[in-house]
Amino acid sequence: MRKLTTFHYVDIHSHILYGVDDGPDNIETSIEMMKIAYDEGIRKIVATPHYHPGKCTMGYEQLRRNFELFKEQMKDVCPEIELALGREIYYTSDILDDLEAQAHLTMEDSKYILIEYHPTVEYSYLRTSISNVMQMGYTPVIAHIERYMCVLEDWKLALELKNMGAVIQVNAG
């Protein structure tokens, strides 16, 4: 008899951290989100509050404190789920300077960065920005690529970005 394999997933793009930008307003909603994630087989969640210069700019120290408190509160809710902190970076021309100055924009101190673009981004801009980020030594994770018109018009472009070394993230729901 064959043994069934249980697959577990990692959610690398989550606004589960309550009280921060797109996150829930309260801990009760975060707890419910954790339970749903667990039921769906997720065993690691990277909380990725937005980083958008001039808009979503909560300081890193405050964000880290909020995250550590959240992590402590969630310990008894779903102890099997590992929590990590990252950011969802809205790409602008200033981001390269910010990346150079602030390593805390990565996913849990790794070389991976989650990058979001405007839905009508031009493919040439998207490609150039990915190349620039990679030249700095980071691995770009392109957030919700299914939202970008240039890619919707030609899905081969997503493969081209992947072949450059970018990671492609799509929303599941």
Regions found by a protein language model. Name each.
Residues 1-80:
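An N-terminally biased module of ancient metal coordination in phosphate/nucleic-acid-related enzymes
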Residues 14, 50-51, 88-89, 145, ...:
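Active-site metal-binding loops of divalent metal-dependent hydrolases
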Residues 15-24, 155-160, 170-173:
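Metallo-beta-lactamase
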Residues 57-169:
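Extended substrate/RNA-proximal surfaces in nucleic-acid metabolism proteins
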